[in-house]
Amino acid sequence: KIYFISPVWWFRLTPRTEIFFDEVFTPGFAYKFKSITKTYSYPISFLKGKKLRTYITHGAPALPVLTLYVNSVKLRLVMGVYSFVFGWKLSLFTKTKQFWSVPFVSDKKREKYLKVVEKDIRRDINLIKI
């Protein structure tokens, strides 16, 4: 199981997270391109069997990001990075969770966010067969 936790800066994950993707999820290690024609190919994932969870924290409220900006942070991450590296699967969307207005929410709301993460991790631990 792979977990990513990152804040969003300027509608992207942090530069350190982006650099990690650039330097680790490289062609030849994470995926390769399969040619269809001379000018077109598609990615074949080498990490298809890996399980992934992502938690993204936003300073912004949900409404403008999900509507005006068409949820571009999550869409870019899942479609632009994860589908290359982990192959296409619906769980890449459902297991990428976003927490909104993090610097401005109450402690109670922040605790609720943390409980979501804890619940997911406990669920993952219980699925591990020893």
What spans do the regions from the language model cover?
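Helix-loop-strand module that forms the ligand-binding subsite of alpha/beta enzymes
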Residues: 1-75
